[in-house]
Amino acid sequence: MAKDDVIEVDGKVIEALPNATFRVELDNKHVILCHIAGRMRMHYIKILPGDRVKIELTPYSLDKGRITFRYK
């Protein structure tokens, strides 16, 4: 999939689930499931409930996403 096809949104982590999966509430109050991107996993970036994150969504499935950035 091309990089142009992704939708980037911001949200807040509300719950940590098993297997590096998180429940994230978007700024528009929708709640989706997200997993951590591979580079974040490689660099051991920890994500905790309450963190602000940037999420990439595909146009094919808007209820699952990938966490690509954790704001400070």
Swiss-Prot record:
- GO MF terms held by the record: ribosome binding; rRNA binding; translation initiation factor activity
| Alphabetized Pfam families for the sequence | eIF-1a (PF01176)
* Major place of residence: cytoplasm
Q: Which UniProt keywords apply?
A: Cytoplasm, Initiation factor, Protein biosynthesis, RNA-binding, rRNA-binding
Q: Give GO cellular component annotations, separated by semicolons.
A: cytosol
The subcellular location is: Cytoplasm
Q: What family is it from? A: Belongs to the IF-1 family.
The family database entries (NCBIfam families) matched by this protein are listed as:
infA (TIGR00008)
Main function: One of the essential components for the initiation of protein synthesis. Stabilizes the binding of IF-2 and IF-3 on the 30S subunit to which N-formylmethionyl-tRNA(fMet) subsequently binds. Helps modulate mRNA selection, yielding the 30S pre-initiation complex (PIC). Upon addition of the 50S ribosomal subunit IF-1, IF-2 and IF-3 are released leaving the mature 70S translation initiation complex.
Return the protein name: Translation initiation factor IF-1
Question: From what organism does this protein derive?
Answer: Wolinella succinogenes (strain ATCC 29543 / DSM 1740 / CCUG 13145 / JCM 31913 / LMG 7466 / NCTC 11488 / FDC 602W)
Q: Which gene encodes it?
A: infA
